[in-house]
Amino acid sequence: MKIRIISEIKELYSIKDDWDDLYSKADYSTFQSFEFNYYSWLTELSKAKGNQLCVILLTTNERACAILPLYIDFKKRLRFINDKHADFCDVLSNEKFDFEDILSEIRKHFKLYSVHFINLTEDSFLYALYKKKVWKNSLLKSFEKYSTLNLDKGTFPYNVLKYTSKQKTEFRRIKKKSAENTHHFLLKDNSNFPIQDIYQLKERMIGLGLRKANFLNEDRLILLKELYNSNRMIVSMVKSKSNICAISFILRNTNEYLFWIDMYDNSKMINIYNYISFIERISQENNTKINFGRGVYDYKVTNFKPDIKQLFAFYIFSNKLQLLIFLFVDNIKEILKSIYKKIKR
């Protein structure tokens, strides 16, 4: 098995076919797709001082057998590309490999202080890798949570057996309240990327104080447009006459749909109405899995009753002192979060 480090954007584009081939052979999320990683690096991460592209390509008999979509940040931490905004992180691989060999190769070329792999599911390659081996100066810890809802083909919400009559009535009430609105289901095949609608709603959200001024900057919009144009993303939109009330950017992977980024104004329950309208439409066609993404928000849990699952983070440090410092700082952060939650109540 040969290890190749991709450190330049031109090199990265040159392995697109290998990447697409590996991606097609397993049930990866959109966050492991070439488009997400390439445009995340090109439009955002490459512009930040101190970041170094460090994608790993493993080959056996001249054929790609694994890709690790990584970079090194200004603190010399090895991370997944765009891990802050990727709900799920993982490698693409159809063969086992020794991660220690990869780390050794990276250290021959770049200074590296630690490894920070976040947003790992229990069935991710790297979670399994950690469980099979004792790693010196390492840590596996619970990270955030995510939630999913499986639906049989049929009419929502009646195709979700666990919903009570009261819950179904509540869905009908929300739909009735927004009856004057129209729902739009946008794909590359039927509509151009709705950039002007996005700008309009973005400005309204900022004006209403619902988002900060840097929300959905131009670099992020380029990434969204590329995902849309590569058919990896759907736009679910709600209009009220000439006004855009809600937009959801939904990542698609066969019959699984992930609500990634939501936009909405101050119309009551408008984001929930957008969710209901999309789920209603998509589950009429096939058995469907809805992924509500990373972060367990009360309004999603209360309304949709999804299954909640745990994400994990895997860290490796250069020495024991680094590990102890990380644990100390992490504990302080948890204490401050706990105090903040109590104050908010």
Predicted regions and their residues:
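Divalent metal-dependent hydrolysis catalytic cores, especially in the metallo-beta-lactamase
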Residues: 112-120
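A gly/proline- and charged-residue-enriched helix-loop-helix capping module
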Residues: 83-110
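Aromatic (often tryptophan-rich) hydrophobic motifs at membrane interfaces
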Residues: 97, 101-107, 211-326
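Short, well-ordered beta-to-alpha junction loops that form the rim of enzyme active sites
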Residues: 119-122, 294-296
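Short amphipathic alpha-helical segments
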Residues: 1, 87-89, 183
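Active-site/acyl-donor-binding loops of N-acyltransferases
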Residues: 5, 9, 130-159, 234, ...
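A conserved beta-strand-loop-helix scaffold within acyl/acetyltransferase catalytic domains
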Residues: 3-61, 65-78, 120-144, 154-266
